[in-house]
Swiss-Prot record:
The keyword Cell cycle does not apply. Keywords: Acetylation, Cytoplasm, Immunity, Innate immunity, Isopeptide bond, Nucleus, Phosphoprotein, Repeat, RNA-binding, Transcription, Transcription regulation, Ubl conjugation. The lineage of its organism: Eukaryota, Metazoa, Chordata, Craniata, Vertebrata. May function as a nuclear receptor coactivator, enhancing transcription through other coactivators such as NCOA6 and CITED1. Regulates centriole biogenesis by suppressing the formation of aberrant centriolar protein complexes in the cytoplasm and thus preserving mitotic spindle integrity. Prevents the formation of the STIL-CPAP complex (which can induce the formation of aberrant centriolar protein complexes) by interfering with the interaction of STIL with CPAP. This is RNA-binding protein 14. Its main location: nucleus. Residues 307-354 are annotated as: TRBP-interacting domain. Pfam families: RRM_1 (PF00076). InterPro entries: Nucleotide-bd_a/b_plait_sf, RBD_domain_sf, RBM14_RRM1, RBM14_RRM2, RRM_dom, SRSF. The modification Phosphoserine is found at residues 161, 220, 242, 244, 256, 272, 280, 520, 523, 527, 562, 582, 618, 620, 623, 627, 643, 649.
Length: 669
């Protein structure tokens, strides 16, 4: 049986003391002492009845008579009375006894200078209020009234620290206070009937007093609508550079910007050209760039390069073509050509390695550089034409035979090409023009060609470094050193053994394979087009991509471009360097196709007044980034499911929205 023991001072009463008090009447199962009462569990009902009869009114402490009775469930409804202005000297027991004279008191809690008394019956509560309100207790006049939070319902709720069914005061319905601190402060609303746990209402949402100045973060729609696009569209921006811009931008240089690139010489293109070709090209080309003599010659002959090209200076430009704006950019333009060039080292590098390293001419070629002017010769390793008159003549001879090699349309150009070079090649135009005709016979004379390269050139090569010192006086050098020997050689050998262009790609010359190959195959595609007369250039561009040297190095897209397309590409402004912030651009012909997507990504319908608190946006890392805050990642906003975006989804949204911005607001695009 459960026995209720009231009027117990929990501060100085222990469970053991109560258990000893009830032990003579039966077996005590447990004893629990609360603040002002206790519960004793006894095994036998008879013992419990005897204990109640014997101990009710017993004074455990002087002046404190115990209230011993059978424990009953708490009434379902209790009436909560608020007692204010309670003296600090008044204890809860004294207050309880005061109210018990008017009816049964279920609970009495004193909190600082006020208290809550729960009475079982409504009539008792009203009688107590009427009799005790304004009564002086311990020197203070108490204020007794029915708690505005209403009555407690149910035993389960009575144990809790606060009432969840209390009615708010009439003055607090508009803006319910936090925990009872309302317009007119009410102790009853602020604190419930708990034993020390202050019973306040659950915190209401703060009213929007200053709605205008609040952060856009808190004014926004529910964030669930922003999280969905984050996961549903993960590839909208991040996958774009590789998907939509991959073909449009990376493949551009060779296809659509081939000629457009040519108009803007950039160091980056030179570097990219240096990095792209094979090993055989890398060092000679860099050396050619480093050669001041070839550079100066190249710079001086840039003008003639595009027009009728004097052979001496033109060949030096051919060697110094890295510095030339037109040919250098054509290098950069042939992105795919250079890519294929990178694939060619298997063949070209093999040619160069086998012939250049093995043949006698290779040794003479190296010794020649070491003999007299190793620095200038090393610099001219790739600028074979700029290297000397001898090599330039050989270069010219190769150029003509090389031009003879691709097709009939190019062999048709060999005539103007030979005429172009008439300044220093005057002794060989006949051989040059006749040379393409014997293209088929070239394959039959690899030995002759190799021998020619080794034996006649060896002597001239030995003499050549002496003339190399006069590299700038290229015309004089051509006539001084090698006009005789080399002219005789090309007249004799070029017609017979030189004239077959088909074998030139298969059977590289011992001396000229590496230098000429490294330079010619990728660069001829653009540089020859720049060198030729207009009609020759037109026919040259019209040739199939594999016509140059049988390996299809020049980009098919670049060569098959019509003249109109070439002109358009030439007129295209240089493409700016793309960044993460660049608007997506899938093609050149329809720049507004993705305007809606751009508006969803970049369009911001935030006014400047709403951006005053934009630093708070860092609280939400991913789902809601609308106004620019700190880092560039903030601009990678995904399309948001926002209702207002439908109004701004026009084609020119990205441009018109900026006009509505405040002038001091930087888009930082």
């Amino acid at each position: 049986m459960k026995i209720f023991v009231g009027n117990v001072d929990g501060a100085d009463t222990t469970p053991e003391e109560l258990a000893a008090l009830f032990a003579p009447y039966g077996t005590v199962m447990s004893c629990a002492v609360m603040k002002q009462f206790a519960f004793v569990h006894m095994r036998e009902n008879a013992g419990a009845v005897r204990a109640i009869e014997a101990l009710h009114g017993h004074e455990l402490r002087p002046g404190r008579a115990l209230v011993v009775e059978m424990s009953r469930p708490r009434p379902l409804n209790t009436w909560k009375i608020f007692v204010g202005n309670v003296s600090a000297a008044c204890t809860s027991q004294e207050l309880r006894s005061l109210f018990e004279r008017r009816g049964r008191v279920i609970e009495c809690d004193v909190v600082k200078d006020y208290a809550f008394v729960h009475m079982e019956k409504e009539a008792d509560a009203k009688a107590a209020i009427a009799q005790l309100n304004g009564k002086e207790v311990k020197g203070k006049r108490i204020n007794v009234e029915l708690s505005t939070k209403g009555q407690k319902k149910g035993p389960a709720l009575a144990i809790q620290s606060g009432d969840k069914t209390k009615k708010p005061g009439a003055g607090d319905t508009a803006f319910p206070g936090t925990g009872g601190f309302s317009a007119t402060f009410d102790y009853q609303q602020a604190f419930g009937n708990s034993t020390g746990g202050f019973d306040g209402q659950a915190r209401q949402p703060t009213p929007p007093f200053f709605g205008r100045d609040r952060s856009p973060l808190r004014r926004s729609p529910p964030r669930a609508s922003y999280v969905a696009p984050l996961t549903a569209q993960p590839a909208t921006y991040r996958a774009q550079p590789s998907v939509s811009l991959g073909a449009a931008y990376r493949a551009q240089p060779s296809a659509s910007l081939g000629v457009g690139y040519r108009t803007q010489p950039m160091a980056a293109q030179a570097a990219s050209y240096r990095a792209q070709p094979s090993v055989s090209l890398g060092a000679p080309y860099r050396g050619q760039l480093a050669s001041p003599s070839s550079q100066s010659a190249a710079a001086s002959s840039l003008g003639p390069y595009g027009g009728v090209q004097p052979s001496a200076s033109a060949l030096s430009t051919y060697g110094g073509q890295a510095a030339a704006a037109s040919s250098l950019n054509s290098y950069g333009a042939q992105g795919s050509s250079l890519a294929s060039y990178g694939n060619q080292p298997s063949s070209y590098g093999a040619q160069a390695a086998s012939s250049y390293g093995v043949r006698a001419a290779a040794s003479s070629y190296n010794t020649q550089g070491a003999a007299s002017s190793l620095g200038s010769y090393g610099a001219q390793a790739a600028s074979y034409g700029a290297q000397s008159a001898a090599s330039s003549l050989a270069y010219g001879a190769q150029a003509a035979s090389y031009s003879a090699q691709p097709s009939a349309s190019y062999s048709a150009q060999s005539a103007p090409y030979a005429a172009q070079q008439a300044a220093s090649y005057s002794s060989q135009p006949a051989a040059y023009v006749a040379q393409p005709a014997t293209a088929a016979a070239y394959a039959s004379q690899p030995a002759a060609y190799a021998a020619q390269a080794t034996t006649p050139m060896a002597g001239s090569y030995g003499a050549q470094p002496v003339v190399q010192t006069q590299l700038n006086s290229y015309g004089a050098q051509a006539s001084i050193g090698l006009s005789g020997s080399y002219g005789a050689q090309s007249a004799a050998a070029a017609t017979g053994s030189y004239g077959a262009a088909a074998a030139y790609g298969a059977q590289p010359s011992a001396t000229l394979a590496a230098p000429y190959r490294t330079q010619s195959s990728a660069s001829l595609a653009a540089s020859y087009a720049a060198q030729q007369h207009p009609q020759a250039a037109a026919s040259y561009r019209g040739q199939p991509g594999s016509a140059y040297d049988g390996t299809g190095q020049p980009s098919a897209a670049y060569l098959s471009m019509s003249q109109g397309a070439v002109a358009n590409a030439n007129s295209t402004p240089p493409p700016y360097e793309r960044t993460r912030l660049s608007p997506p651009r899938a093609s050149y012909d329809d720049p507004y196709k993705k305007a809606v997507a751009m508006s969803k990504r970049y369009g911001s319908d935030r006014r400047l007044a709403e951006l005053s608190d934009y630093r708070r946006l860092s609280e939400s890392q991913l789902s809601f980034r609308r106004s620019p805050t700190k880092s560039s990642l903030d601009y990678r906003r995904l399309p948001d499911a926002h209702s207002d975006y439908a109004r701004y989804s026009g084609s020119y949204n990205d441009y018109l929205r900026a006009a509505q911005m405040h002038s001091g607001y930087q888009r930082r695009m």
